């Protein structure tokens, strides 16, 4: 079948510029604007590739029916346009769409789908036997160099190749081509899903240079940006950053992206003014997107200029850059004149790879990056402006991840607390459901401060599924943790926002600011409170906690918080609610309110499910196939 071009333009032009368009247009092709061509197993994956490409705004994907030439099948054509859109023409078998950079919802590079009868081609560097495609996928996920895989089933025509798991990679991280092949299954590494078991090394080592193969060099203002660039480069495993004080002027601010056959540096040398570290691609549930809110003073980022506008401040300049979909970074030059009202010049810029082409210092300017991609990160890491006010009563928006879980039978009432951890997921305590027989009687209310706000017409989320840890027996024995899957996904707002799960790599973090929140009793014989209560509580070692609960065993699955002298504590009605701790300006869900003796009794701290110990279980249930 030949390509069918019918020059019939769709009415889809400037009206969509800068807007979020999620529709995929069947039998349609964007005309012009080609940047590069990749290969993808379907249009949705092509959209993911476009979204994470520094310049792609639109794409066209070619299905099998688009051409009689199989080499053109599965091509993903990435496109750009100064007007942010392109004319669209009819083309049989083509599917077109827009990058999700314009969208406010969470975007992930995670792709768990399996593609039956597709052979995704690349360099086959490892071959082994596996029992299933899932086993092969996990093997790829746990291999440092693997980008994608192909598994030959037990019905594969060649007997000697049956159950073979081929691990593959390419320079770009995407297949070099995709062909039809019966009795094979292909898929991608799940590293970007946060499901790798490889070691996660978060340290950045000062006065250190790594050797081995340098696969690319880019400009970066600091080692943290360099690490982000390495993390999102398909082949970068570790990096060395040369600071602005590096003795060779032409090499200053260079970010050297590196790899090795072993996956680790073969040697490291002491070098002043150099910093080295590792990609975070292997880190579980914490792979960040390129999001940097820092301002770099007395610094000029060079690149292709998109526009020059007036701005009151560097913050306003960054906002303008963020609101311009093609802007990747900016430089703000403060005004030296008083006649223009103090406005400075805001230079909006971009480059082929999303990084400055050169970085100059001592210019008096202030530079930084767009925040547009920050929403694509695990949104919980956004440094939301929560303010902890005095007293014991919370205010609106103070704890945007806190929910109140109501049961409607026999009469509607507050049952437990819980925490938003995803747009369709609530983490709470298993013991809340000891008497609940069906999710149909549950309602989740978010953004609520006072229970009295809840009326018959107050919007809520229905619960599709209750997932209780299969090892749960009773709260005092541990495993007191449960997930609620909502019937519909929520949109994030200032009063409805997820909290981060703690990373398994952060087990030794010393949290110094922890708060427990809920509508529970303030004393043993009391009633549910109308206004959301809060209490700042210190974490306690399990040994200290065990001393107060000799009749129970305090395990690593539990974490305790409270004061030795008693007083502030969680109580009845707080169950399932969050123990929220702040670290590096990011809030983490350290505990889920589980059990305790009394309310705020001396040497009887509150006992919480230790969330970090359940991260794998949470990810399995919320991100599993």
Curated annotation (Swiss-Prot):
Disulfide bonds: 20-103, 46-76, 50-56, 110-193, 136-165, 140-146, 200-283, 226-255, 230-236, 291-374, 317-346, 321-327, 380-500, 416-432, 514-581, 545-560, 571-599
PTM remark: Activated by factor XIIa (or XII), which cleaves each polypeptide after Arg-387 into the light chain, which contains the active site, and the heavy chain, which associates with high molecular weight (HMW) kininogen. Activated by F12 (activated); the presence of negatively charged surfaces accelerates activation. Activated by F2 (thrombin); the presence of negatively charged surfaces, such as polyphosphate and dextran sulfate, strongly accelerates activation. N-glycosylated on both chains. N-glycosylated sites mainly consist of nonfucosylated sialylated biantennary (in high abundance) and/or triantennary (in low abundance) complex structures.
GO CC annotation, single: extracellular region
Keyword terms, alphabetized: Blood coagulation, Disease variant, Disulfide bond, Glycoprotein, Hemostasis, Heparin-binding, Hydrolase, Protease, Repeat, Secreted, Serine protease, Signal, Zymogen
Regulation: Inhibited by SERPINA5.
Enzyme class, broadest EC rank: hydrolase
Residue ranges constituting the Apple domain according to the UniProt record: 20-103, 110-193, 200-283, 291-374
Reactions performed catalytically: Selective cleavage of Arg-|-Ala and Arg-|-Val bonds in factor IX to form factor IXa
Location of the Peptidase S1 domain: 388-623
Gene Ontology biological-process annotations: blood coagulation; proteolysis
Places the protein is found: Secreted
GO function terms (MF aspect): heparin binding; serine-type endopeptidase activity
Pfam families, per database record: PAN_1, Trypsin
Residue numbers binding heparin: 547-550
Keyword Lipid biosynthesis part of the UniProt annotation: no
Main location, first listed in the record: secreted
Subunit structure: Homodimer; disulfide-linked. After activation the heavy and light chains are also linked by a disulfide bond. Interacts (activated) with F9 (inactive and activated) in calcium-dependent manner. Forms a heterodimer with SERPINA5.
Linked pathology: Defects in F11 are the cause of factor XI deficiency in Japanese black cattle. It is a hereditary mild bleeding disorder with an autosomal recessive mode of inheritance.
Similarity comment text for this entry: Belongs to the peptidase S1 family. Plasma kallikrein subfamily.
Full protein name: Coagulation factor XI
């Amino acid at each position: 079948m030949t390509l069918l071009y019918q020059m019939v333009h769709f009415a889809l032009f400037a009206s969509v510029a800068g807007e979020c368009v999620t529709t995929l247009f069947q039998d349609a092709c964007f005309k012009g604007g080609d940047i590069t061509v990749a290969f993808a197993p379907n249009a949705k994956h092509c959209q993911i590739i476009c979204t994470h490409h520094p310049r792609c705004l639109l794409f066209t994907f070619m299905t099998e029916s688009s051409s009689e030439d199989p080499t053109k099948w599965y091509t993903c054509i990435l496109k750009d346009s100064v007007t942010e859109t392109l004319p669209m023409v009819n083309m049989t078998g083509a599917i077109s769409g827009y990058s999700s950079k314009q969208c406010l919802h969470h975007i992930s590079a995670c792709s768990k789908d399996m593609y039956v009868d597709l052979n995704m081609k690349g360099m086959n560097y490892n071959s082994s036997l596996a029992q299933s495609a899932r086993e092969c996928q996990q093997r790829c996920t746990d291999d440092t160099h693997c980008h994608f895989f192909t598994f030959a089933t037990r019905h594969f025509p060649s007997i000697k190749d049956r159950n073979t798991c081929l691990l593959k990679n390419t320079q770009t991280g995407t297949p070099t081509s995709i062909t039809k092949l019966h009795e094979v299954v292909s898929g991608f590494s799940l590293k970007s899903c946060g499901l790798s078991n490889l070691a996660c090394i978060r340290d950045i080592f000062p006065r250190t240079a790594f050797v081995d193969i340098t696969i690319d060099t880019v400009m970066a203002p600091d080692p943290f940006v360099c690490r982000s660039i390495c993390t999102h480069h398909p082949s970068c495993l570790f990096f060395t950053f040369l600071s602005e004080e590096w003795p060779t002027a032409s090499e200053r601010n260079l970010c050297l992206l590196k790899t090795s056959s072993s996956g680790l540096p073969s040697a490291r040398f002491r070098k002043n003014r150099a910093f080295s570290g590792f990609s975070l691609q292997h880190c579980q549930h914490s792979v960040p997107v390129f999001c940097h809110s820092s301002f770099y003073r007395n610094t000029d980022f060079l690149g292709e200029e998109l526009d020059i506008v007036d701005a009151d401040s560097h913050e306003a300049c960054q906002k303008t850059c963020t609101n311009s979909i093609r802007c990747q970074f900016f430089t703000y030059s403060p005004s030296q004149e008083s006649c223009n009202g103090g406005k400075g010049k805001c230079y909006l810029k971009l480059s082929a790879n999303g990084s400055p082409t050169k970085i100059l210092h001592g210019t008096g300017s202030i530079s930084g990056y767009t925040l547009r991609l920050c929403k694509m990160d695990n949104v919980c890491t956004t440094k939301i402006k929560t303010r902890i006010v005095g007293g014991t009563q919370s205010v609106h928006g103070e704890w945007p991840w806190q929910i109140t879980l109501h049961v409607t039978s026999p009469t509607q009432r507050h049952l437990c607390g819980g925490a938003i951890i995803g747009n369709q997921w609530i983490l709470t305590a298993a013991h809340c459901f000891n008497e609940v027989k069906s999710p149909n009687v549950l309602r989740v209310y978010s953004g609520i401060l006072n229970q009295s706000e809840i009326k018959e017409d107050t919007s809520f989320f229905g619960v599709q599924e209750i997932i209780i840890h299969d090892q749960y027996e009773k709260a005092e024995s541990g495993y007191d943790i449960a997930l609620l899957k909502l019937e519909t996904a929520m949109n994030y707002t200032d009063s409805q926002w997820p909290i981060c799960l703690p990373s398994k790599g952060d087990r030794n973090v010393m949290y110094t600011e922890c708060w427990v929140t809920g509508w529970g009793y303030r004393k043993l014989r009391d009633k549910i409170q109308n206004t959301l209560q809060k209490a700042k509580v210190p974490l306690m070692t399990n040994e200290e906690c065990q001393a107060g609960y000799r009749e129970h065993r305090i395990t690593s699955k539990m974490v305790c918080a409270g004061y030795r002298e008693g007083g502030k504590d969680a109580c009845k009605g707080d169950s399932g609610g969050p123990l929220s701790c702040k670290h590096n300006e990011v809030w983490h869900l350290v505990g889920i309110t589980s059990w305790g003796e009394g309310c705020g009794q001396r040497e009887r701290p509150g006992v919480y499910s230790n969330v970090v110990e359940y991260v794998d279980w949470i990810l399995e249930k919320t991100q599993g196939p």
